[in-house]
């Protein structure tokens, strides 16, 4: 499993940082802001939805998620990346934000992105490292399946059909 990166902002308890746990398993690699480069970056401030069409970007450059605190989300608003995408709405399964729309842990966001671009096995492998992880797929199975087969132009309509 290669091509999964994270930008660690040191905003949370390091013991709860999901991407750091994945790094300990050799499933993700930390990068600094200069190391982001052309990687496909997940950010809630992107104008463009992630879709299956982005699989080629993942394959070529990798995927980078921002590991930070939702309580300090405004601190990343000013960060701009060359290739940035946002996830469509999904429900969190992590114990801190269970059932909240869009308040995903970094591993949930990473797994959702991988699922949407067609890397289901990798998404499951990442989530399996957390006791609550696979529940994320169960909780979001229908929207994830629809997002993963849709063109970018259809994502907003699918999101609205599930989450209003």
Curated annotation (Swiss-Prot):
<dbReference type="GO" id="GO:0005737">
    <property type="term" value="C:cytoplasm"/>
</dbReference>
<comment type="function">
    <text>Aminocarboxypropyltransferase that catalyzes the aminocarboxypropyl transfer on pseudouridine corresponding to position 914 in M.jannaschii 16S rRNA. It constitutes the last step in biosynthesis of the hypermodified N1-methyl-N3-(3-amino-3-carboxypropyl) pseudouridine (m1acp3-Psi).</text>
</comment>
<keyword id="KW-0698">rRNA processing</keyword>
<dbReference type="GO" id="GO:1904047">
    <property type="term" value="F:S-adenosyl-L-methionine binding"/>
</dbReference>
<keyword id="KW-0690">Ribosome biogenesis</keyword>
<keyword id="KW-0949">S-adenosyl-L-methionine</keyword>
<comment type="similarity">
    <text>Belongs to the TDD superfamily. TSR3 family.</text>
</comment>
<keyword id="KW-0808">Transferase</keyword>
<dbReference type="InterPro" id="IPR022968">
    <property type="entry name" value="Tsr3-like"/>
</dbReference>
<dbReference type="InterPro" id="IPR007177">
    <property type="entry name" value="Tsr3_C"/>
</dbReference>
<dbReference type="GO" id="GO:0106388">
    <property type="term" value="F:18S rRNA aminocarboxypropyltransferase activity"/>
</dbReference>
<feature type="binding site">
    <location>
        <position position="66"/>
    </location>
    <ligand>
        <name>S-adenosyl-L-methionine</name>
    </ligand>
</feature>
<feature type="binding site">
    <location>
        <position position="18"/>
    </location>
    <ligand>
        <name>S-adenosyl-L-methionine</name>
    </ligand>
</feature>
<protein>
    <recommendedName>
        <fullName>16S rRNA aminocarboxypropyltransferase</fullName>
        <ecNumber>2.5.1.157</ecNumber>
    </recommendedName>
</protein>
<keyword id="KW-0963">Cytoplasm</keyword>
<dbReference type="GO" id="GO:0000455">
    <property type="term" value="P:enzyme-directed rRNA pseudouridine synthesis"/>
</dbReference>
<feature type="binding site">
    <location>
        <position position="106"/>
    </location>
    <ligand>
        <name>S-adenosyl-L-methionine</name>
    </ligand>
</feature>
<dbReference type="Pfam" id="PF04034">
    <property type="entry name" value="Ribo_biogen_C"/>
</dbReference>
<feature type="binding site">
    <location>
        <position position="87"/>
    </location>
    <ligand>
        <name>S-adenosyl-L-methionine</name>
    </ligand>
</feature>
């Amino acid at each position: 499993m290669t091509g999964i990166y994270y930008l660690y902002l040191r905003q949370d308890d390091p013991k709860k940082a999901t991407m750091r746990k994945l790094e300990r398993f050799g499933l993700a690699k930390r990068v600094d802001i200069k190391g982001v480069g052309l990687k496909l970056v997940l950010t809630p401030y992107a104008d463009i939805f992630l879709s299956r069409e982005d699989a080629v970007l993942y394959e070529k450059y990798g995927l980078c998620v921002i590991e930070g605190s939702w309580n300090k989300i405004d601190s990343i608003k000013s960060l701009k990346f060359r290739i940035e995408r946002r996830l469509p709405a999904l429900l969190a399964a992590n114990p801190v934000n269970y059932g909240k729309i869009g308040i995903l842990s970094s591993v949930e966001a990473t797994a959702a992105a991988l699922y949407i671009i067609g890397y289901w096995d990798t998404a499951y492998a990442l989530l399996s490292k957390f006791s609550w992880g696979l529940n994320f797929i169960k909780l979001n199975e229908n929207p994830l399946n629809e997002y993963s087969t849709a063109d970018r132009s259809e994502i907003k309509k699918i999101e609205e059909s599930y989450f209003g």
